[in-house]
């Protein structure tokens, strides 16, 4: 057999495939001096794209901690796996689907969920939970002096549309597939107007001795295509995800995949059933780069080659070329390596589930990907040329200072006569703090009947492990504004807060996954931000013993040269020894003591001024951003988390809520509103403005509540751990009363605070941008 005729490749064709002249020359060298066929050019284009090759990030990702005594599988497979005891393990991962979700919000978000679910069950794990971290541009024009008004009405209208489409897509796919969505986070900043972020997380359970890997082994074993038929949707999706957006990006809708969650549910059941027979040797999802990626990566991992015949590939459109078949990213497809002679067992199982299952090739011993059509070779590439020998760039770094004041602007003045009650209500209604009920009420969070803590009930999502009293807690977190101000410190906070949320459920963090969203890596300051974020994640994960088991990098989140804030999103998973000993977020009843657990001494006024500029209060109420994120002592953070888990597992704590966005005042109100419980809070005098006490976002703090009888024991255990346990008040009545040194500073009914907090997002999305008036 000979390689099919080569059409002339022009510099324009090479450029359109996202390849540089230098990369094209390297391709020719790897092919023994010949030029690639058009099909091979497409294959190199997707496999060498930033999305698939990690060519700009790989040198930095090597610094991440990836090992612990519990890690079964780290980065490099479809998902990471950690041992959770009793013969079980959990597979989990977070990935981005940012670019498709801007072009086609519903399908982009839906297929993002579908893709992460396939990554989980490809490992042999049954998905039991999903979460999502979403970032959008502003959804309101100015409703107070602080809100950024640079977003145009057209941008806000677009942001409404994108958000509604994304949330609907996430809900539709997860609900139809039958996996509970346990929440996540939703944030708004101006930088996401042209670059929304959709980061999907999934977790599944697998028996420790029944894990499957994406490796092609056993020369002569059949290669079997299963699942949906191949169409033209998603062609060059991976390449699109490695480019900036321009004014013509809307024309890229054909690059966005179309998902079918019902078919994916069938695929899940068929795959898990086939795995139980022992016939499956290896399995790989056809995700980014489709058949191309699954073929070459399985061969590379297994040290073998894979030969496939495109005439056998099930197709739903006529006249598809080899180029289109290899680059299609049609959803709900898998590639299996089966034991030779047992093919019929596979066919029967998938036929029972109404799915295509076709032998399209075999495993070879030459470490090459070989693609044939009508018996003619249309692509023949060494696996290493597409994987290990892909370009790796150590791009230049340039330290960058954000264009903000590092010290508090002179125009900012604090006065004790301010109406803090009104400011609190404005803050509760602000997009980043207000209730995201409108989002998570669209998700089915009770399907599978394992959910212990649903969205809005706790800082982390919690599921029980059936057949035992044990459970798993999971949380997502990331503060991009803090990473904008200080990438390293902001990344440390993302890890710490995600782990703290898990600890608030009474679970011990055991592993992490990261989704790293950035602008153009060809810009030195972007790569400096990226490197700093990696350093921050590394430091925090080492200190908190949460190794990174896998994740995703999404570069080129820019539109017309304007990039997003550096946005690392961290997912942390923790083990809960007894699901009956967990803590909700809300105060359950009156007559309970409220305690502020904190790891640190109260800071001085100078530090507080510098750190306050990164708070939600500064942005929303004062209309300014300055300074740095709060300082973070990771050793003390780890101690706080251990103390919190010990208190909850001892049955002493009824509720626990991370003190984060909006500071202490917001944490108290968020804890009070679900059950409609009032508060009587008395804070001691400190040499700080009241704003800092109420709304400062100091690190390593948790608000807990307890029966008064339990208070002495809580204080004793806290002292043993070296953690401060300040009694700040108690629950009662139907009002919130907060005093500082005996001076009333906040007085409001629970009802009016609930109205501000719970209805804000719905009101914003119901309101046309052109009629939103400023106060």
Name what the model sees in each region.
Residues 3-88:
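N-terminal amphipathic, basic-rich helices that act as targeting or association modules
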Residues 52, 58-111, 115-117, 121, ...:
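Non-catalytic terminal/interface segments that mediate subunit docking, oligomerization
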Residues 5-17, 23, 33, 38-41, ...:
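Glycine-/charge-enriched secondary-structure boundary and capping motifs
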Residues 45-49, 62, 351, 517, ...:
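Short amphipathic alpha-helical surface patches that mediate protein-protein
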Residues 2, 7, 77-142, 155-355, ...:
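Mobile "lid/hinge" segments at catalytic clefts and subdomain interfaces of large enzymes
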Residues 149-151:
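Short, low-complexity intrinsically disordered segments enriched in A/P/G/S/L with frequent Arg
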């Amino acid at each position: 057999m000979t390689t099919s005729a080569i059409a002339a490749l022009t510099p324009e064709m090479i450029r359109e495939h996202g390849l540089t002249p230098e990369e094209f020359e390297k391709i020719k060298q790897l092919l023994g001096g010949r030029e690639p066929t058009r099909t091979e050019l497409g294959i190199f284009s997707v496999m060498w794209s930033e999305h698939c090759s990690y060519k700009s990030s790989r040198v930095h990702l090597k610094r991440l901690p990836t090992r612990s005594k519990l890690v079964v599988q780290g980065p490099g497979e479809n998902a990471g796996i950690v041992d959770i005891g009793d013969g079980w393990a959990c597979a989990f991962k977070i990935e981005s689907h940012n670019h498709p979700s801007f072009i086609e919000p519903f399908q982009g978000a839906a297929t993002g969920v579908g893709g992460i679910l396939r990554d989980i069950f490809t490992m042999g794990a049954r998905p039991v939970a999903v979460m999502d971290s979403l970032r959008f541009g502003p959804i309101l024009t100015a409703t107070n002096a602080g809100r950024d008004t640079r977003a145009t009405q057209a941008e806000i209208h677009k942001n409404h549309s994108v958000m509604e489409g994304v949330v609907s897509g996430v809900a539709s796919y997860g609900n139809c597939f039958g996996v509970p969505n346990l929440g996540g986070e939703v944030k708004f900043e101006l930088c996401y107007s042209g670059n929304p972020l959709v980061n999907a997380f999934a977790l599944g359970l697998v028996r420790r001795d029944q894990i499957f890997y994406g490796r092609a082994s056993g020369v002569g074993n059949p290669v079997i295509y299963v699942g949906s038929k191949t169409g033209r949707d998603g062609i060059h999706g991976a390449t699109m995800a490695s480019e900036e957006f321009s004014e013509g990006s809307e024309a890229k809708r054909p690059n966005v995949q179309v998902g079918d969650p019902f078919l994916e549910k069938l695929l899940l059941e068929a795959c898990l059933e086939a795995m139980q027979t022992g016939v499956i040797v290896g399995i790989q999802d056809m995700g980014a780069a489709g058949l191309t990626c699954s073929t070459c990566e399985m061969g590379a991992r297994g040290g073998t080659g894979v030969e496939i015949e495109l005439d056998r590939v099930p197709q739903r459109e006529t006249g598809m070329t080899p180029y289109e078949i290899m680059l299609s990213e049609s959803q709900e497809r898998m590639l299996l390596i089966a034991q030779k002679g047992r093919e019929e067992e596979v066919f029967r199982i998938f036929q029972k589930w109404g799915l295509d299952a076709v032998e399209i090739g075999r495993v070879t011993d030459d470490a090459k990907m070989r693609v044939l059509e009508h018996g003619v070779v249309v692509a023949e590439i060494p696996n290493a040329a597409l994987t290990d020998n892909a370009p790796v760039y150590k791009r230049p770094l340039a330290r960058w200072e954000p264009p903000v004041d590092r010290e508090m602007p002179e125009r900012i003045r604090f006065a004790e006569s301010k109406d803090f009650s009104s400011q609190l209500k404005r803050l509760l209604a602000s997009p980043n703090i207000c209730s995201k009920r409108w989002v998570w009420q669209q998700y089915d969070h009770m399907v599978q009947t394992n959910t212990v803590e649903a969205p809005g009930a706790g800082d982390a999502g919690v599921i029980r492990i059936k057949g035992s009293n044990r459970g798993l807690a999971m949380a997502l977190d990331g503060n991009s504004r803090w990473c904008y101000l200080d990438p390293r410190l902001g990344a440390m906070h993302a890890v710490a807060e995600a782990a703290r949320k898990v600890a608030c459920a009474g679970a011990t963090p055991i592993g992490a996954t990261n989704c790293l969203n950035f602008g153009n890596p060809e810009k030195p300051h972007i790569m400096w931000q990226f490197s700093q974020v990696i350093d921050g994640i590394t430091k925090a994960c080492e200190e908190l013993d949460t190794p990174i088991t896998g994740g995703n990098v999404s570069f080129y989140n820019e539109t017309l040269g304007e990039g997003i804030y550096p946005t690392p999103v961290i997912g942390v998973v923790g083990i809960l020894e007894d699901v009956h000993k967990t803590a909700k977020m809300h105060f359950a009843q009156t007559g309970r003591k409220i305690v502020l657990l904190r790891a640190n001494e109260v800071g001085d006024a100078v530090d507080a001024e510098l750190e306050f500029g990164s708070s939600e209060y500064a942005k929303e109420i004062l209309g300014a951003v300055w300074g740095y994120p709060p300082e973070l002592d990771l050793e003390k953070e780890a101690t706080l988390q251990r103390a919190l888990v010990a208190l909850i597992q001892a049955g002493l704590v009824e509720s626990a809520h991370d003190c984060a966005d909006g500071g202490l005042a917001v944490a108290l109100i968020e804890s009070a509103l679900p059950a409609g419980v009032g508060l009587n809070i008395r804070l001691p005098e400190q040499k700080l403005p009241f704003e800092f006490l109420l709304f400062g976002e100091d690190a390593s703090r948790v608000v807990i509540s307890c029966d008064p009888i339990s208070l002495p024991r809580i204080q004793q255990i806290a002292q043993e751990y070296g953690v401060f346990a300040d009694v700040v008040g108690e629950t009662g009545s139907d009002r919130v009363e907060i005093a500082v040194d005996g001076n009333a500073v906040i007085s409001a009914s629970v009802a009016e605070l609930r109205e501000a907090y719970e209805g804000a997002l719905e009101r914003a999305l119901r309101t046309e941008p052109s009629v939103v008036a400023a106060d």
